[in-house]
């Protein structure tokens, strides 16, 4: 999915050439097993990758699991591929598996230009909550809460560590764990009533156009510089590249854009199945195939 010039079809064609040039794969490679940790961006990229693989005669499957369970599944050779290693925020979680030689990170990121940090509605930003250091001043309005995503996520761990270590004076705050959809619903409810809320925001995601919101400055030491600027990498189970070289070549060529992902994520958040959302996007964007 290299989109500026290369395309899905070109990527697929490269894979077809690879299939002719490389020795036949293990029959088990036909069943490519993806992990999805319940994030709409990963559902979108996994959906697009699955559409390409299906067109090449593969039978991709998806397992929904938390991040630790997904990595454990790769360690145990129950999962082959995960398209959502957000670096650097997920590094503490994945590093033990990499050091143990159980997971391989592909060299080229599948997405650049992502970001990942705390955010607030624009009206709250305009009132003065613009920086991590401002959060404590708004404790009463916020109800002493910071809204995160699913339990076990590295983002929640970062927020919890801030609270535990009293970073930015947050020792009296509480992390509210939820799902992506649950957290966004809470943020949207707060927006309709113009209540104060601090929540986890990221891009790519439709929230950036669906809500008037601002990312908080000052969190470089927690989420990373430039509002948690991130690269997203593809990871595979150790040995997968050698066992399934044709699929591996395709995975090495998968690259997405923030705009593309956001367009596919929108329908997914409206309950459209990821593969269907991916197919619809590709049909509506024929230039993708050129």
Describe the residue ranges of each PLM region:
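A bilobed periplasmic-binding-protein/Venus flytrap-type ligand-binding module shared by bacterial periplasmic
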Residues: 115-125, 229-243
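Ligand-binding pocket segment of bilobal, Venus flytrap-like solute-binding proteins
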Residues: 79-84, 151-220
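A conserved helix-loop-strand patch within extracytoplasmic ligand-binding domains
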Residues: 102-151
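C-terminal functional modules
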Residues: 111, 254-290
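Short, well-ordered beta-strand elements
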Residues: 26-41, 58-63, 143-147, 251
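Immediate post-signal peptide segment of exported/extracytoplasmic ligand-binding proteins
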Residues: 23-33, 53-54, 137-143, 288-290
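Pocket-flanking alpha-helical
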Residues: 46, 63-101, 182-186, 206-212
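Ligand-binding cleft/hinge of the Venus flytrap
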Residues: 48-57, 139-173, 280-284
């Amino acid at each position: 999915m290299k989109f500026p010039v290369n395309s899905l079809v070109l990527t697929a064609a490269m894979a077809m050439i690879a299939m002719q040039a490389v020795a036949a794969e293990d029959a088990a490679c036909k069943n490519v097993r993806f992990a999805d940790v319940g994030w709409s961006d990963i559902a979108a990229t996994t959906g697009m990758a699955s559409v390409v693989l299906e067109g090449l005669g593969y039978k991709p499957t998806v397992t929904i699991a938390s991040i630790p369970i997904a990595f454990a599944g790769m360690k145990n050779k129950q999962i082959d591929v995960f398209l959502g290693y957000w670096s650097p925020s997920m590094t503490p979680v994945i590093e033990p598996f990499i050091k143990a030689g159980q997971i391989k990170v592909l060299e080229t990121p599948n997405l650049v230009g992502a970001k990942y940090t705390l955010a607030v509605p624009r009206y709250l930003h305009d009132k003065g909550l613009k920086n991590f250091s401002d959060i404590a001043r708004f404790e009463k309005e916020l109800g002493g809460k910071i809204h995160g995503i699913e339990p076990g996520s590295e983002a929640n761990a970062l927020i919890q560590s801030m609270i535990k270590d009293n970073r930015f004076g947050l020792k009296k705050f509480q992390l509210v764990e939820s799902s992506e959809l649950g957290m966004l619903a809470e943020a949207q409810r707060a927006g309709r009533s113009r209540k104060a809320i601090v929540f986890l925001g990221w891009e790519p995601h439709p929230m950036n156009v669906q809500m008037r919101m601002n990312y908080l400055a000052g969190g470089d030491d927690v989420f990373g510089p430039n509002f948690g600027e991130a690269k997203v990498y593809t990871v595979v189970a150790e040995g997968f590249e050698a066992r399934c070289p044709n699929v591996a070549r395709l995975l090495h060529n998968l690259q997405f854009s923030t705009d593309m992902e956001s367009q596919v994520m929108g329908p997914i958040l409206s309950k459209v199945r990821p593969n269907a959302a991916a197919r619809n996007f590709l049909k509506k964007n024929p230039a993708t195939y050129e």
